[in-house]
A protein has these predicted regions:
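Local sequence-structure signature of Cys/Sec-based thiol-disulfide redox active-site neighborhoods
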Residues: 1-29
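C-terminal alpha-helical interaction module
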Residues: 2, 7, 44-45, 73-75
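Short beta->alpha junction loops/turns
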Residues: 10, 33-36, 62
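Residue-level recognition of oxygen-bearing side chains
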Residues: 16, 38, 68
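Non-catalytic interaction surface on structured domains
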Residues: 22-27, 45, 71-72
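Thioredoxin-like thiol-disulfide oxidoreductase module
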Residues: 33-50, 77-79
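Structural micro-motif
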Residues: 48-56, 66-67
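Non-catalytic, surface beta->alpha helical segment in thiol-disulfide oxidoreductase systems
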Residues: 58-79
Length: 79
């Protein structure tokens, strides 16, 4: 399973998302859209124009943000 988290340096929910993924022992790739302008275009395309972070992509499918991630976890998606 490939997990990508699009985030920024100033986003507290992004930190919370990364902390939860670490707690759940789920490896992920972090893409900091505020550090690399090329990632902004990718972020917009992959997330269908989402403007808020974090945004999470699992196996090339955009699943949404923090609450969507926790809902997947509660539903047993990562078991």
């Amino acid at each position: 399973m490939k997990i990508i988290v699009y985030s920024t340096n100033t986003c507290p929910i992004c930190v919370k998302t990364k902390t939860l993924l670490d707690k759940w022992n789920l490896p992920f790739e972090q893409r900091m859209i505020d550090e690399d302008r090329a990632l902004m275009a990718e972020f917009s395309k992959v997330t269908n124009g989402a403007r808020m972070v974090p945004q999470i992509v699992i196996d090339d499918k955009h699943i949404g943000g923090f609450s969507d991630l926790t809902e997947l976890h509660m539903d047993g998606f990562f078991d």
